């Protein structure tokens, strides 16, 4: 079995009747899978995001993050057709400014019903990335 954890964060999302996040080490612990599952009774906009100091380049459902000579590849595995975008992570006072910080986003507009967002994060390994993506299974089966 793969090392994994699932957290119920429904109380943080009033628009969802259920909201779960799973994190698993996959592909012989060479990658991390972040998977969110939400039950949304009405259409809403959902944004999956990660904040980083890295330089970020996107290409549809893929992104490469570079920092201090290291690379991390991000790929949206679900839903089909979803794409990444990048925005500034800088904030206004009185918050910490976060100069140079970026946010890698996957935004779903009019999301409704059973919604799954799955993002695979893979460091750049010397022997290259894994050849295939892991199978996406419901969090209840983790």
Q: Across the structure, where does each feature detected by a protein language model lie?
A:
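CBM-like, beta-strand-rich accessory domains located in the C-terminal region of large
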Residues: 1-142
């Amino acid at each position: 079995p793969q090392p994994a954890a699932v957290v119920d964060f429904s109380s943080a999302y009033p628009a969802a009747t259920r909201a779960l996040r799973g994190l698993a080490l996959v592909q012989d612990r060479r990658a991390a899978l972040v998977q969110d599952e939400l039950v949304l009774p009405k259409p809403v906009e959902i944004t999956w995001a990660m904040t980083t100091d890295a330089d970020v380049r996107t290409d549809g459902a893929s992104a490469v993050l570079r920092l201090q000579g290291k690379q991390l590849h991000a790929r949206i595995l679900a839903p089909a057709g979803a794409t990444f975008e990048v925005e500034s992570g800088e904030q206004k006072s009185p918050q910490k400014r976060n100069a140079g910080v970026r946010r890698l986003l996957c935004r779903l507009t009019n999301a409704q019903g059973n919604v799954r967002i799955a993002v695979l994060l893979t460091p750049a390994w010397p022997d290259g990335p894994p050849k295939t993506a892991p199978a996406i299974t419901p969090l209840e089966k983790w």
